[in-house]
Amino acid sequence: MANKDQNLTLWYDQLLSKAQLVSYGDVKGTNCFLPNSWNLWLQIQRLYNNATALIKLKDKVILKQFIPIEPLPYTVEQVQLPTLSFYSEYQKEKRHVEGFNPELFLIEQIGTKKLHDPLVLRPTSEIAFCNLWKKQSFSYQNLPVIYNQWTCVFRAEKNTRPFLRNSEFYWQETHGLFSDGVNSESAAIAFWKLYQDIIVNQLCIPAFVGLKSPNERFAGAQNTWTVESIMPDGQALQCATSHDLGQTFTKPFGLTFQNQANQQAIPYSFSCGISTRILGALLLTHSDDFGLVLPWKVAPIQVKLYLFDKKGDTKTVELAQKVQTLLEQLAIRFQFIKVENQLGKQLGQGEVNGIPFQLIVDNPQTVNIFNRLTRVKTAYSFEQLASRFVELVQQYHQAMYDKAKAVVQQKVVQATTLKQIEQAFNDKKAVLCAVRLTDTLEQQLKERYQVTVRCCLEQLQKPQICPFSGESAQDYVLIARAY
């Protein structure tokens, strides 16, 4: 494979191929997800579903040793909505249609019949959920209602790359309807924090979290909270977002509920989502020149156990069976393979596929463990393995985060002067700085430096000067080029 540090683009393309992650679709910006990538996406779905399920599920045994995902105090029910809607529906919310118009896939003809009202392939589902809820009856007693769907969406993109920017991609989108704005906003923040938990604590991806600027927030949102990560090339990648929608959609679509005063009132809504773009973040953050490197919590196969016994030694087989039983007791996702030849080839493919630990039993006394992160092979007796394996997994998890954080720290500059900022941009790095955030500044950043304000991390408590305008700064922000 190409060297990741020297040619990230070529390295990424080769990784997708060698790890058998995607096959390119016939239409630009579409991909066929192969088992290795889709199973990874299913594990991320599991994390989210477990935290939001009606019956809160808990990971078994070994996974409890990590920081667990804190289940949300909300009931989220799974639904599936249509892909098609009418273009006229999008025109009911001006900011929404203006924000999405350049990206919409429109169907203007069916067979030989031209459509008076074109159909839209779903770019997002705020409108579809409003139309669903409009057909239902609500009172303050049965609100909130929160629905989630795992689906695909369509947005026309000029420059496409698998996982990072696609014309068709997969995501989950959660939509909630509330009787008041305070609780709707609180839910948006709670789901945003859940994304932080998944991305940072489970996927080991360092992140910057905060509010989107008014120009970068979701079309129609009152506020958008984001989780941004910095990739090895210094570009930011938006990993997940959550939106306080207020009454932006519920009002024009005529949604009402019966309040405690027995009157009809307009409800409030929020939405949030994480997409297969997170797979791109995971690949770029952790993988190396030898292939995939996967976080323990989402690796579809966490351990591969090889029995390599050409002599048919009974005690070697018994040791392998003992290791198999141990892995079952620890509720680990593992694969047991009896190998008669070409063990090296099997281990090499396991390395490319990012298996966190490969265990080799080829004698009655020891188990060899190959650690994917460190690429070191170590021999353990069964007793040592049984007593230390949980610790090894914990070390793997922490070392993965620490390694990723060290790379991010090299790609982000804390700056106080315009000279420092411009030098960072020239070096293709992201910038943390205090600014007076205005439309003029955001336009200047795009036109002059080809960067954007990725998120506002906090409002300043102490006086600082904006290096761009010389005026009093108000926000501490992350500025970067973006995928």
Curated annotation (Swiss-Prot):
GO cellular component: aminoacyl-tRNA synthetase multienzyme complex; cytoplasm
Enzyme Commission (EC) number: 6.1.1.15
GO-annotated molecular function: ATP binding; proline-tRNA ligase activity
Record's keyword terms, sorted: Aminoacyl-tRNA synthetase, ATP-binding, Cytoplasm, Ligase, Nucleotide-binding, Protein biosynthesis
InterPro entries given in the database record: aa-tRNA-synt_IIb, aa-tRNA-synth_II, aa-tRNA-synth_II/BPL/LPL, Anticodon-bd, Anticodon-bd_dom_sf, Pro-tRNA-ligase_IIa, Pro-tRNA-ligase_IIa_arc-type, Pro-tRNA_ligase_II_C
SMART domains, per the entry: ProRS-C_1 (SM00946)
GO process annotations (BP): prolyl-tRNA aminoacylation
Catalyses which reaction(s): tRNA(Pro) + L-proline + ATP = L-prolyl-tRNA(Pro) + AMP + diphosphate
Listed Gene3D superfamilies: Anticodon-binding domain (3.40.50.800), Bira Bifunctional Protein, Domain 2 (3.30.930.10), C-terminal domain of ProRS (3.30.110.30)
PROSITE patterns assigned: AA_TRNA_LIGASE_II (PS50862)
Subcellular location: Cytoplasm
Quaternary structure annotation from Swiss-Prot or TrEMBL: Homodimer.
Assigned protein family: Belongs to the class-II aminoacyl-tRNA synthetase family. ProS type 3 subfamily.
UniProt remark on domains: Consists of three domains: the N-terminal catalytic domain, the anticodon-binding domain and the C-terminal extension.
Function: Catalyzes the attachment of proline to tRNA(Pro) in a two-step reaction: proline is first activated by ATP to form Pro-AMP and then transferred to the acceptor end of tRNA(Pro).
Protein name per Swiss-Prot or TrEMBL: Proline--tRNA ligase
Species the sequence originates in: Mycoplasma pneumoniae (strain ATCC 29342 / M129 / Subtype 1) (Mycoplasmoides pneumoniae)
